[in-house]
Amino acid sequence: MRFSKQPSQKGEQKDARIVQLIELIELHYREQKNCQFYSDALALTSKRLNELVKADRGKTVTQLIHDRIILEANRELVFSTKTVKTIAFELGFDDPAYFSRFYRKQKGETPAKFRHRCSDSTI
């Protein structure tokens, strides 16, 4: 019975690092899209951070960052009248065309098509 606390402490430590990572992504996803930034902030190697995240979330750090960018892009596309170009710049993309390619790769459709599809479904 005395050993029962050891695994939970490790689990709590891992969870704390994951929580810290999510908080960091939330704060910096617009300007920091590189795993190295987050691993440095958490004093872990990129490889170790990815191992922890993969075990906990089933995704890599980069996938979590991309998911957060797409979530914000979707919100802006649906709930604002901002242009795709403006949204791209606000999300830290220097080139709106690159943002559109990134979005299409992640979602399987362009930002404009997503916006159009969502506006059609709300009528």
What is each residue range found by the language model?
Residues M1-P7, I22-N34, V53, R57, ...:
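Basic, amphipathic alpha-helical hairpins
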Residues S8-I18, L24, K59-R68:
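Short, Lys/Arg-enriched anionic-surface-contact patches
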Residues Q32-C35, S39-D40, L44-D67, L71:
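Charge-rich, low-complexity intrinsically disordered segments
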Residues Q36, K47, T83-T86, P96-A97, ...:
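Residues within helix-turn-helix
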Residues L42, L91-G92, Y103:
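Core residues of bacterial helix-turn-helix
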Residues L49-N50, Y98-F99, Y103:
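Short hydrophobic/aromatic patch on the recognition helix
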Residues A55-D94, H116-I123:
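Terminal helix-turn-helix DNA-binding modules in bacterial transcription factors
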Residues R101-I123:
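…primarily DNA-binding HTH/wHTH and HhH modules…
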